[in-house]
Amino acid sequence: MSEVRIAEKKVWVDQTPVKLLSGEVHYWRLDPHQWRNTLERVQEMGIKIVATYAAWDYHEIAPGQYDFTGETEPRRNLLAFLDLLTEMDFWIIFRPGPYIYSEWSNGGVTDEAVKYHRGSVEFQQLAEPYMRAVTNIVLPYLATNGGKVILWQADNEIDPWPHLYTEVLGLGTKPGPFQEFLIEHYQEDLDALNRAWRTTYSSFEEARAVSEIFRDDPVLVGRYNDFRAFGHWYVNQVATWAATRYREYGVDVPIIFNAYSGVSTQRWADLEAIGDLVGSDIYPSNEHLHRPGEQRHIIEALRYAHTFSKVPYVAEFEAGIWHDWIRDVGAFTPNHYRLICISALLGGAAGWNWYMLVNRDNWYQSPINEWGWTRPDLFNAFTEITRLFERLDPTTLEKVTDTAVTFSPAQRSSSRPGQEMLLSFHEADIDYAFFDLDGALTDKKFAFYAGGPWLSEREQRRLAEFIENGGHLICIGAAPSQDEHMLPLNLLDIQPYTGIMTGAPGKMNLKLFEHGTVESAWLQLYQHVPGEPLIVERLKSSAQPSEELALQFSLQIGQKYTIGYTEPRGAGRLTVIGLQPTPGLILALHHHYNVPVASRSNISGITTALYRRDGDYYLIATNDSVDPRGAEVHFGHGLLADGQWTVENLDTGAIRQITLQDGVGCFITLPRKDGAIFRLSPAQSS
């Protein structure tokens, strides 16, 4: 019997490594006569793994009766499809539900099952016979039994769907699972619930959910946080049930889960702990033109996965789109696919599953159509991306950065603070690692707090531990002083500011440290601070005032204000700064504290990240702007030695020589809405 495991950002079948680059093909939505020539096109693309759902409601032809061999309809012949994949030497990712969504009736479950939420006893009793039946049929195809199935997905994008199952979840007028969660969450302590909610309930059954955030009411924000925590609890309950059942039925290959891309409805790290791997589902608009911040969100999703996952992985990566979304996302170009894939690699992706590689009902703009014919422009782009992935081999790369940014899954699923800071990091082109406050301590020693004024006790203690162990925590404009229910909690003992000064009508130009100027629309003022005070001096405004008000504007020049402090704590340091977290300020802090920025473009719109393997460095760069751009990339002091370097474009194979001096000397040009990957090798070893 073979062993299948996940390690070193790959799946291993005994001693054979398998990189997770795959594509989705749905057998029951294609004419079986087209299976072979369609899969031949997939092979020509260079893909070696095929993923597929199996639809419960399609295979259950009568209650408790299943057709997996095509007796009632050739498209139901799951076994023939698995046999063909095996014959063609594809590895297989099997995704049998019970929910699959997949733009399919009822999301793939039967008409009877859909009446019940998936965490209910009724739903699970209906689902388990199908789960056992499909498992029994597919067991011989598991790689542990000499077959080709290497991963098994349990359910799909698990979600309580509170808008659909409101009453039965206890979110409306009567109690249910939500109240069961509260009893567990508050450890049967009704007084603790009443303190947190500022209520006087006589039983948990009286508690009602706040399922919409009202930001102006702190009490309701706290109650909303409990609603979001209920969602995470529910998802974990369902995931545990699904994974447990499949394992009981004999599945002994790694079990995977998928999740929405925003880290809100599901806690990714929890799902990976319940199973073996979790991946996000990412569907941006064409060339990031229709929704703001899409590239940043792709990169952030992979940065976060990089902090905890065995394989930073996209379980569903856009390849075509559901017909109802075409108006929202636009018609996809070859550049679109190159841009999003190189953006994912920049963020740290080590694998993905293209969904869908082949058109089918309700799904269009894939590189292969239902007849096995290709759309040449897209097919060629996918083939090029596959070759680039193989040449890069992201599974063996080491990310180069000394900077971390905190990540709270609870905050991310609720009020989502810290967005201005994350945007500023992106605009400054400063790469970083996320520090998951629910996970292990980061090994980075320079961390920025990207959160709001509330943070749970557990997470505040995590920050204190980080500082005590030698980390430098920087809070810009916001620091934790309350728990998740907006009750006072200041475990970091952060000095509160005494006032806020505005720079209306524009931003103030300020001198901070010795590294030039920063701008901020407001200042948080401090009178008495621990440690060393941080002082800014107002300079002449960068916005030229009208002539008649020039004298009034000049009155503020030279004024100095204490806007924070820095002090040692244990083996580390805490720095608190009452300014906007602008790109200029974040860069100035790196300079002041001698923290190198691994790679940084001098032109806006170009985003970079630096990785290394053995003695070589890999610069991944994208141009998200609408026009071609050239940029000089600066490398962190001391990272790349001065002298001659060989630069190879992994996509085109073009090779050139550059001379680096103090990290300067690398110029790149990128087409609009595209990217490139460069290998930098010391010239003497090339």
Regions picked out by a protein language model, each given a short descriptive name:
Residues 56-75, 104-121, 219-223, 327-328, ...:
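Surface-exposed, active-site-proximal loop segments in enzymatic domains
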Residues 39-44, 85-87, 142, 268-273, ...:
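Acidic (Asp/Glu)-rich catalytic clusters
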Residues 1-49:
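N-terminal carbohydrate-binding accessory modules
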Residues 127, 131, 135, 147-150, ...:
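Carbohydrate-binding surfaces of carbohydrate-active enzymes
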Residues 21-23, 50-52, 92-96, 150-154, ...:
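Hydrophobic faces of well-ordered beta-strands that scaffold small-molecule active sites
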Residues 35-111, 242-247, 454:
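Aromatic-lined substrate-binding rim segments of carbohydrate-active enzymes
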